[in-house]
Amino acid sequence: MSQMLSPDMTIAAEAVTKAKIEVKNLNFYYGQSKALKDITLSLPERSVTAFIGPSGCGKSTLLRVFNRIYELYPKQTAEGQVLLDGQNVLDRSQDLNLLRTKIGMVFQKPTPFPMSIYENIAFGVRLYEKISKAEMDGRVEQALKRAALWTEVKDKLNASGLSLSGGQQQRLCIARTVAVKPEVILLDEPASALDPLSTAKIEELIDELQADYTIVIVTHNMQQAARVSKQTAFMYLGELVEFDRTEKIFTSPREKRTQDYITGRFG
């Protein structure tokens, strides 16, 4: 049985003990193929954790287990435990709609709905809450402000979300996620399709959001992981090789495979 991995103890003790997500002995299968192998780690709340590793290492697969979005596809199964505030999200009695409001997700490619900017935000809220028009207006404004988009779109809320630039569309997707009041935000390569200026805005936004949300980001960009995260997990061939403070991972990793990856010897 693998040992629970938490970031180095030089992180303040309270940040380590207040785990938002605990993964215990997690295995994941695509059909008969084992994609995640006995993963165990603990993610602190209101902090940014990055998953890094070469393509096919399992980092996006692990991310998609957290809100069970893998169940949208056939022949994909998870074994073990993923605890959100102590409750196992893999329990078959879990309400998946409720789970996905608690754990929101933003994908690699911006995915605005083919509707107005306003409705992109309001649509998800209506699925879970009955609120007045005035309350909805406030919720939309608040979400767009949290995503650093309000000043750019406040005078064109009825315009199509598809009319926005790529970077604006991605921030709209973040606003849509924030609007349903999640506790955790999963980001799967959120800036990989964006230009450097839009990427910088997304990274600045991540830094601001961590005050209120637990954030997990998958990225191929190691410089980005170093800039935005407090903890980093390095994965390779479905295994968790090392998990520690981001600074330690990038300056003095314990594992040779980690050092080889971050220095470009493979990847």
Curated annotation (Swiss-Prot):
Residues 21-262 form the ABC transporter domain. InterPro entries: AAA+_ATPase, ABC_transporter-like_ATP-bd, ABC_transporter-like_CS, P-loop_NTPase, PstB-like. Gene3D superfamilies: P-loop containing nucleotide triphosphate hydrolases. It is a peripheral membrane protein. It holds the Pfam family ABC_tran. One of its GO terms (cellular component) is plasma membrane. It comes from the Bacteria. GO terms for molecular function: ATP binding; ATP hydrolysis activity; ATPase-coupled phosphate ion transmembrane transporter activity. Part of the ABC transporter complex PstSACB involved in phosphate import. Responsible for energy coupling to the transport system. Belongs to the ABC transporter superfamily. Phosphate importer (TC 3.A.1.7) family. This is Phosphate import ATP-binding protein PstB. It comes from Mesorhizobium japonicum (strain LMG 29417 / CECT 9101 / MAFF 303099).
